[in-house]
């Protein structure tokens, strides 16, 4: 067992070491990581990290929700599902084994009950969108107080419900976790007595009759979340109490945008990458991330839509036109940080990269 001589918290300056990998469902594996120094993990339940995966063609940056809770700080777990055509997750399933060390960036994200405390919760998820819900439910379970959570997860088949055993174990110990599984079809040659079909308003009323009184958290593919939003709004739910996690872009937030200056494709800009000693020219409509790649530099990035915050760098000179989707805080912007993936240089800009 790891001995902790002094309590300290992990930071992303230190790599993560894979200590176990656990199969969960078809093409789904939970990877458990520890800090080589023995540092503990401190994060909000529901947050994510971005992993730098050393793939043969060059590093890949992929963002994954932390499926463990901060109430269990000796390890950080990530539960991933390899989709058709996926490269990063498939690389993890095929190549990431016990003893390997990889770089991680984070934790980050505001999708957490920490920011929206309530007496009663309704967690609605589909597929791998279950992972932040598991983390938040585990944190409530570990708090020592009985929670009030209706936990709905939708999957194609019962065998594809991710982390089902973990959730059913917690639900078997206390009465405050009410699990509702919804599948499109049963597994061959296996009976299924739970809900079947696509999530809809009728199911919602049956599974959580007091949904109007609950704080709602939703995570899953965008079509699924859109259906949930429309169902709740159509039933008169107060949508200010609805929260969702998504890695697809929504209308952006403009930051650090001079009122009288707009990027022009005909105008040239100059970007100085101070740490690399490289200066390059580009159009004002190119992003700083694209300019860095064209110059042969690597700025870690994940979603490339201003959501995950992986490409955050400090701007030391000049102005940029940045339109993001929640991947950077107002405090970071005030401190001079920008997101390279959605920041366009105006005239001359210098960044620490």
From Swiss-Prot:
FAD-binding FR-type domain span: 11-114
Binding site for [2Fe-2S] cluster: 303, 308, 311, 341
Function: Reductase involved in the catabolism of stachydrine (L-proline betaine), a source of carbon and nitrogen. Part of a Rieske-type oxygenase system that catalyzes the demethylation of stachydrine to produce N-methyl-L-proline (monomethylproline). This subunit is probably involved in the transfer of electrons from NAD(P)H to the catalytic subunit Stc2.
Observed phenotype of the null mutant: In strain Sm2011, the insertion mutant cannot grow on stachydrine but it can grow on N-methyl proline.
Keyword Metal-binding in record: yes
UniProt remark on cofactor binding: Binds 1 FAD per subunit. Binds 1 2Fe-2S cluster.
Subunit structure: The system is probably composed of an oxygenase subunit (Stc2) and two reductase subunits (Stc3 and Stc4).
Cofactors demanded by this protein: FAD; [2Fe-2S] cluster
Protein name: Stachydrine N-demethylase reductase subunit Stc4
Keywords: 2Fe-2S, FAD, Flavoprotein, Iron, Iron-sulfur, Metal-binding, Oxidoreductase, Plasmid
Assigned protein family: In the N-terminal section; belongs to the FAD-binding oxidoreductase type 6 family.
Domain annotation 2Fe-2S ferredoxin-type: ranges: 269-353
CDD domains the UniProt entry points to: fer2, FNR_iron_sulfur_binding_1
Species name: Rhizobium meliloti (strain 1021) (Ensifer meliloti)
EC number: 1.-.-.-
EC class name: oxidoreductase
